[in-house]
Amino acid sequence: MKFLALLSLVAAATAAPAALEARGATTCGSTSYSASQVTAASNAACNYVQSGTTAGGSTYPHQYRNYEGFYFQGLSGPFYEFPLRTSGVYNGGSPGADRVIITGNCDEAGQITHTGASGSGFVACSGTS
């Protein structure tokens, strides 16, 4: 009986990380990102914002004005955008279409993309409103 209780506890504990990862993953256009890719980009953006520096010779992260009016989980700005990549963390060069958005306090607000947007605007990636 104790063995079954222990087995149930172990099964629940090992299932929890997968559920957390699924919440942080996103899809921007047809490109999917894992939770760890989103977190890595958000952490890099946070480090740059806190140190007042940018990635490589780029302007990222830079302030995002939210002209589109995203809700971003009810978080308050200022917001900062930083490129989201499938291969490693952005360190300069072409930023691609996808971005993570963080607050000045380094809270992860959401993910947005130029893919499917008009002009230079943005649309939400999955999980962002």
Curated annotation (Swiss-Prot):
Record-annotated disulphide pairs:
28-125, 46-106
SUPFAM superfamilies reported in the protein's UniProt record: Microbial ribonucleases (SSF53933)
Top enzyme class, one word, equals lyase
Gene Ontology terms, cellular component aspect?
Answer: extracellular region
Origin superkingdom = Eukaryota
What subcellular compartments does it reside in? Secreted
One molecular function GO term is: RNA binding
Q: Which residues form the signal peptide?
A: 1-15
Catalyzed reactions:
[RNA] containing guanosine + H2O = an [RNA fragment]-3'-guanosine-3'-phosphate + a 5'-hydroxy-ribonucleotide-3'-[RNA fragment]
EC numbers on record:
4.6.1.24
* Active site: residue positions: 62, 81, 114
What keywords does the record list, in alphabetical order? Disulfide bond, Endonuclease, Hydrolase, Lyase, Nuclease, Secreted, Signal
Family, as annotated: Belongs to the ribonuclease N1/T1 family.
- The name this protein carries in UniProt is Extracellular guanyl-specific ribonuclease ARB_00194
